[in-house]
């Protein structure tokens, strides 16, 4: 091994000879005699690069070794092509290819500010730059132009830290323009969570229509009450009333007018001159009035509460049993499909009964009848979380169904232990009375019953022990009469129906099929299949989707599955499991206040 030394030795020293190549003195050494490493990796660290950059920056200030002048807005910046090219792929492409700029001493760049170029060069030559609220926008745009991603990201991060109700909408628009998805999302989330404050600032009034709708239609909008949304929309419209008046109806379709307090609705909304002079808004006002009278019977996207108000739509499962001949369950439990949480409510009274009927009236729940020949009717007060006995049925029954139509409860058909019943009773909650109305054309038990387009529909059922019906019987409360409509494609009993968006959906009956009926056009269609056959399942509409809960399988055992069908996509998915298998239970949707409501 040869070890090169950096000093001269006396020729007389033992073992020294002249190097023929360099005339320097070297030692002849045996590698075996070395006890340490054969080499030493030395690094001065990042300070070396910093020192070089510092010197280059001094060269730039002194115009020493500069080989290009960048001209921006008439101001000249002497620079080094090598430094610019090393830092920016934009300049590397400009100077390293056969472009005209690679040969010219003076290169003019348009579209940026001279001040921005000064900040940019400060970063290029020092690795440091001061980002402020005054320069962040043009510094971001300059770093984007010159493809300096590190500086660009630093500017975006700085903007995130500056979010405030007075500027978040402007920053969001900036992020959208420059495809900054992370910053855009954070701005939108911030604006949703501080909407009450955001809507008071000038930026809010300068939103375009689509941007405004994007906020007011969101379920994630954080507000104390829906009145805040209405007032924000009206402020926006009145800001440029002549231009924005034609947009009022479209905007109000995204305000949940039915959820406004009735007093506020009457004293503020209905008397607003702009609304009064907009006939196209009358239908929205009518919908709100109907909801104030009918409650949850009247469902639309505008009747779904925003979660930030503390209220949410929940599915309430009432009673049921685990298997045929099994123990009747006393439980009343609510399920929130958004959070997946189950909560216990007051237990069902006199739970020894089975095969009763359940429906929701406004925001309360009714349970009627039950095996054997019970006339009892109970109502669950959702505000007090208690069950209250109300007026009894005129005729005891079980295997019947209930539905609400125009604010009144209808008990339909059923079985009295000997015969299928055609009798129909109507309950007025204000007078607490049951009255007989026109009977069914065909007596059935275990049909599917729901209301839609102002009429009551009784679908299928069992006219006797051995047969199933495919008839669809429609009741008109104005004429107190029944008509037969288009038959369901398959005759079934123990089926369940719900209505959504003026369509009726039917499932159960030990079939996988989910059918949809259009009562206006009077025709049926098969829309989807469930994953297994079941009957006597629960079915309810919640958050604009249809949920199928539990039911009894072909072997007689109950199931704990929950399926969710989305009519918008026609996709059915398995969601979760119920606390226990159950069938012959009631399922309804109500609004419930959450103890753990959303807070910032």
UniProtKB/Swiss-Prot annotation:
It is found in: Perikaryon; Cell projection, Axon; Cytoplasm; Cell junction, Desmosome. Gene3D superfamilies: 1.25.40.420, Kelch-type beta propeller (2.120.10.80), Potassium Channel Kv1.1, Chain A (3.30.710.10). Transmembrane segments: none annotated. Keywords: Cell junction, Cell projection, Cytoplasm, Kelch repeat, Repeat, Ubl conjugation, Ubl conjugation pathway. One of its GO terms (cellular component) is cytoplasm. The keyword Cell membrane does not apply. Autoubiquitinated. Autoubiquitination leads to proteasomal degradation and is necessary to control KLHL24 levels. One of its GO terms (molecular function) is ubiquitin-like ligase-substrate adaptor activity. Residues 168-270 form the BACK domain. InterPro entries: BACK, BTB-kelch_protein, BTB/POZ_dom, BTB_POZ_KLHL24, Kelch-typ_b-propeller, Kelch_1, KLHL24_BACK, SKP1/BTB/POZ_sf. One of its GO terms (biological process) is intermediate filament organization. Its main location: other. Signal peptide: none annotated. Expressed in the brain. Pfam families: BACK, BTB, Kelch_1, Kelch_KLHDC2_KLHL20_DRC7. Kelch repeats lie at residues 314-363, 365-407, 408-454, 456-502, 504-544, 546-592. Forms homodimers. Interacts with GRIK2. Component of the BCR(KLHL24) E3 ubiquitin ligase complex, composed of CUL3, RBX1 and KLHL24. Interacts with CUL3. Interacts with KRT14. Necessary to maintain the balance between intermediate filament stability and degradation, a process that is essential for skin integrity. As part of the BCR(KLHL24) E3 ubiquitin ligase complex, mediates ubiquitination of KRT14 and controls its levels during keratinocytes differentiation. Specifically reduces kainate receptor-mediated currents in hippocampal neurons, most probably by modulating channel properties. Has a crucial role in cardiac development and function. This is Kelch-like protein 24.
């Amino acid at each position: 091994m040869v070890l090169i030394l950096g000093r001269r030795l006396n020729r007389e020293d033992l073992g020294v000879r002249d190097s023929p190549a360099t005339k320097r003195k070297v030692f002849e050494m045996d590698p075996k005699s070395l006890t340490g490493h054969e080499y030493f990796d030395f690094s001065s660290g990042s300070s070396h690069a910093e020192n070089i950059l510092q010197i280059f920056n001094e060269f730039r200030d002194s115009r020493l070794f500069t080989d290009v002048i960048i001209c921006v807005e008439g101001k000249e910046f002497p620079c080094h092509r090598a430094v610019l090219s090393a830092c920016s792929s934009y300049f590397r492409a400009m100077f390293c290819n056969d472009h005209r700029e690679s040969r010219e001493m003076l290169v003019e760049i348009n579209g940026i500010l001279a001040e921005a170029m000064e900040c940019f060069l400060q970063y290029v030559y020092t690795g440091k730059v001061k980002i402020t609220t005054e320069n962040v926008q043009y510094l971001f745009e300059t770093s984007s132009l010159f493809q300096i991603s590190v500086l660009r990201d630093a500017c975006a991060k700085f903007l995130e830290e500056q979010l405030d109700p007075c500027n978040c909408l402007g920053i969001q628009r900036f992020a959208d323009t420059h495809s900054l998805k992370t910053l855009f999302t954070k701005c939108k989330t911030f604006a949703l969570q501080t909407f009450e404050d955001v809507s008071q600032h000038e930026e809010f009034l300068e939103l375009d229509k689509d941007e405004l709708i994007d906020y007011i239609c969101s379920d994630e909008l954080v507000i104390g009450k829906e009145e805040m949304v209405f007032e924000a929309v009206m402020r926006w419209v009145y800001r440029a009333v002549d231009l924005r008046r034609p947009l009022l109806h479209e905007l109000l379709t995204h305000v949940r007018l039915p959820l406004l307090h009735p007093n506020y609705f009457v004293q503020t909304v209905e008397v607003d001159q702009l609304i009064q002079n907009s006939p196209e808004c009358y239908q929205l006002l009518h919908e709100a009035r109907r909801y104030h009278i009918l409650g949850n019977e009247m469902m639309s996207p505008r009747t779904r509460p925003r979660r930030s108000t503390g209220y949410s739509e929940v599915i309430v499962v009432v009673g049921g049993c685990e298997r045929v001949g099994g123990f009747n369950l006393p439980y009343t439990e609510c399920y929130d499909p958004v959070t997946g949480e189950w909560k216990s409510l007051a237990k069902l009274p006199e739970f020894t009964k089975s095969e009763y009927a359940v429906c929701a009236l406004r925001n309360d729940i009714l349970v009627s009848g039950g095996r054997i020949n019970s006339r009892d009717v109970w109502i669950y007060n959702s505000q007090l979380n208690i069950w209250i006995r109300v007026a009894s049925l005129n005729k005891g029954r079980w295997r019947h169904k209930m539905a609400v139509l125009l604010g009144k409860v209808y008990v339909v058909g059923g079985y009295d232990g000997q015969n299928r019943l055609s009798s129909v009773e109507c309950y007025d909650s204000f007078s607490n009375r049951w009255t007989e109305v026109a009977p069914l054309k065909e007596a059935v038990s275990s049909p599917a019953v729901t209301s839609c387009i102002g009429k009551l529909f009784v679908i299928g059922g069992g006219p006797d022990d051995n047969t199933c019906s495919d008839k669809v019987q429609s009741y008109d409360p104005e004429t107190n009469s029944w008509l037969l409509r288009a038959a369901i494609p398959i005759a079934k009993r123990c089926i369940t129906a719900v209505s959504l968006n003026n369509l009726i959906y039917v499932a159960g009956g030990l079939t996988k099929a989910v059918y949809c009926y259009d009562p206006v056009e009077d025709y049926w269609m098969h829309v989807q299949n469930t994953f297994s056959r079941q009957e006597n399942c629960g079915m309810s509409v919640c958050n604009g989707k249809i949920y199928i809960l539990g039911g009894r399988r072909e072997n007689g055992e109950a199931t704990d599955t929950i399926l969710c069908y989305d009519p918008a996509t026609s996709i059915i998915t398995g969601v979760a499991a119920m606390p226990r298998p159950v069938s012959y239970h009631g399922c309804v949707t109500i609004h419930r206040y959450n103890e753990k409501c959303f807070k910032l």
